[in-house]
């Protein structure tokens, strides 16, 4: 197989985004758009990827890391000039080079592969990825001759009235013979309305030399859209969301309302999971079979076990076991482990806590920096007081303990196995196994005293 290379154009300023964040780093489905392009290209067995950077170069390089080499475009003088910056890294290589834009995150690896194969099949020096659109305003037009061969690409601003009627457009993605590409780039001029060096002019140069130029048309216009402003960003987000959701549904996941369900690309969901409207699944979340998520729940970097139900709740960087019932309005904060057959009820916050199997924290409690054993019942209003203003401390509640309502456990403290904490207690010392601990003032009743306040 011939050597394969890629050049990704990511040097532009992206002023229409009106953002402090570099355009290429704006996320689509939770992942920077340029990262999507790199990820898809990596699937077509490339020998090298070169990303052209300019504005925000260091941030783009930090995002892509070792997945790409980089060339710097000091002045933004057009797409042809941008590709030319990769000359030192690629000029001596033999093979094919894919040129793609960093703001086209929806192009699939399969389409890149089809373009390369079509390029090889036609024996072309250059192949263009094209598509048809009803309103081609703003796009470069693909001009063909009477034999239906590609003659040139003309940018919208440079197109005459007849050329502007053409509906076949240049998507900005190409496949070139590598050495032919860099030879032709040196002949490109900036004699055009923008005063820039256009990459599409390479097509005209190669045709004048008698070289074959082919065009591979994708029927999916949505796949080719470039993102230049927030409107296009939202459209790309919508398309990517639909693509991801439909793939999960084909794999046996029930999504009640796909338009109201957001799933990022790295999320794994097993079959027979039900996702209700308002579900947001981010990062490397894993949902096991039979689980039911939502409505209105957000999980990030979590693992959720089989047959677990989570409603109206938020969980981050935590592991939830099998047959767990969470919510409504629970918050599972990072580094928590919720065991099997447990309950985390309404208005409960758990942080950096291990909650053992068959234990319950049913309502209105904060359990932070705690190790809770099995079969523990934590009553309503229980607080683990874990912070003294400087340091965090551990609360340990051993197996089969019972914590009464409205109790404060002042860490560091241990509640022993099988022990009881009476409702309303503030516990400052360890509670022995099987003991009853009461730490509250004795009740005093003053007869008829209330009548004094009514006078």
UniProtKB/Swiss-Prot annotation:
Instruction: Name the pathway.
Output: Nucleotide-sugar biosynthesis; UDP-N-acetyl-alpha-D-glucosamine biosynthesis; N-acetyl-alpha-D-glucosamine 1-phosphate from alpha-D-glucosamine 6-phosphate (route II): step 2/2; Nucleotide-sugar biosynthesis; UDP-N-acetyl-alpha-D-glucosamine biosynthesis; UDP-N-acetyl-alpha-D-glucosamine from N-acetyl-alpha-D-glucosamine 1-phosphate: step 1/1; Bacterial outer membrane biogenesis; LPS lipid A biosynthesis
One Gene Ontology term of the biological-process aspect is: regulation of cell shape
Per UniProt, where does acetyl-CoA bind? 386-387, 423, 440
Task: Describe how the cofactor binds.
Answer: Binds 1 Mg(2+) ion per subunit.
Substrates-to-products reaction catalysed: alpha-D-glucosamine 1-phosphate + acetyl-CoA = N-acetyl-alpha-D-glucosamine 1-phosphate + CoA + H(+); N-acetyl-alpha-D-glucosamine 1-phosphate + UTP + H(+) = UDP-N-acetyl-alpha-D-glucosamine + diphosphate
As for subcellular location, the record says:
Cytoplasm
Q: Which UniProt keywords apply?
A: Acyltransferase, Cell shape, Cell wall biogenesis/degradation, Cytoplasm, Magnesium, Metal-binding, Multifunctional enzyme, Nucleotidyltransferase, Peptidoglycan synthesis, Repeat, Transferase
Q: What does the record give as cofactor?
A: Mg(2+)
Q: Where's the active site on this chain?
A: 363
Region entry N-acetyltransferase, spans: 252-455
- Biological function: Catalyzes the last two sequential reactions in the de novo biosynthetic pathway for UDP-N-acetylglucosamine (UDP-GlcNAc). The C-terminal domain catalyzes the transfer of acetyl group from acetyl coenzyme A to glucosamine-1-phosphate (GlcN-1-P) to produce N-acetylglucosamine-1-phosphate (GlcNAc-1-P), which is converted into UDP-GlcNAc by the transfer of uridine 5-monophosphate (from uridine 5-triphosphate), a reaction catalyzed by the N-terminal domain.
The name this protein carries in UniProt is Bifunctional protein GlmU
Source organism of this protein record = Oceanobacillus iheyensis (strain DSM 14371 / CIP 107618 / JCM 11309 / KCTC 3954 / HTE831)
């Amino acid at each position: 197989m011939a050597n394969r290379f890629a050049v990704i154009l990511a040097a532009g300023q992206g002023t229409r985004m009106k953002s402090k964040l570099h355009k290429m780093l704006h996320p689509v489905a939770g992942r920077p758009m340029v990262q999507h392009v790199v990820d898809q290209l990596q699937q077509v067995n490339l020998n090298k990827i070169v990303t052209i950077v300019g504005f925000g170069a260091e941030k783009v390089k930090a995002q892509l890391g070792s997945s790409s080499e980089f060339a710097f475009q000091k002045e933004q003088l057009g797409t042809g000039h941008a590709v030319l910056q990769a000359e030192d890294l690629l000029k001596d290589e033999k093979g094919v080079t894919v040129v793609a834009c960093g703001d086209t995150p929806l192009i699939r690896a399969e389409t890149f592969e089809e373009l390369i194969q079509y390029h090889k099949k036609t024996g072309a020096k250059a192949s263009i990825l094209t598509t048809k659109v009803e309103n081609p305003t703003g796009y470069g037009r693909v001009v063909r001759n009477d034999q239906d061969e590609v003659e040139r690409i003309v940018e919208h601003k440079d197109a005459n009235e007849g050329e502007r009627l053409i509906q076949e457009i240049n998507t900005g993605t190409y496949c070139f013979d590598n050495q032919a590409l860099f030879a032709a780039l040196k002949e490109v001029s900036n004699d055009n309305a923008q005063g820039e060096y256009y990459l599409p002019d390479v097509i005209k140069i190669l045709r004048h030399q008698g070289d074959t130029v082919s065009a591979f048309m994708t029927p999916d216009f949505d796949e080719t859209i470039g993102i230049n402003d927030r409107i296009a960003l939202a459209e790309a987000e919508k398309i990517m969301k639909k693509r991801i959701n439909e793939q999960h549904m084909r794999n046996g996941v029930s999504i009640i309302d796909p338009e109201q369900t957001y799933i990022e690309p790295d999320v794994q969901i097993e079959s027979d999971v039900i996702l209700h409207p308002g579900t947001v699944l981010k990062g490397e979340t894993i949902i096991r079979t039979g689980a039911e998520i939502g409505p209105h729940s957000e999980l990030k970097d979590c693992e959720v076990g089989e047959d677990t139900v989570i409603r109206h709740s938020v969980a981050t960087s935590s592991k939830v076991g099998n047959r767990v019932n969470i919510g409504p309005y629970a918050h599972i904060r990072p580094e928590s482990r919720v065991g099997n057959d447990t309950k985390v009820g309404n208005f409960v916050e758990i942080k950096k806590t291990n909650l053992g199997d068959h234990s319950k924290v049913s309502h209105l409690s904060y359990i932070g920096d705690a190790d809770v054993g099995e079969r523990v019942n934590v009553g309503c209003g229980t607080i683990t007081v874990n912070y003294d203003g400087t340091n965090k401390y551990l609360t340990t509640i051993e197996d089969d303990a019972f914590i009464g309502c409205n109790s404060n456990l002042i860490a560091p403290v241990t509640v022993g196995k099988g022990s009881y904490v009476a409702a309303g207690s503030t516990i400052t010392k360890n509670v022995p196994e099987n003991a009853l601990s009461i730490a509250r003032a004795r009740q005093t009743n003053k007869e008829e005293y209330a009548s004094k306040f009514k006078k």
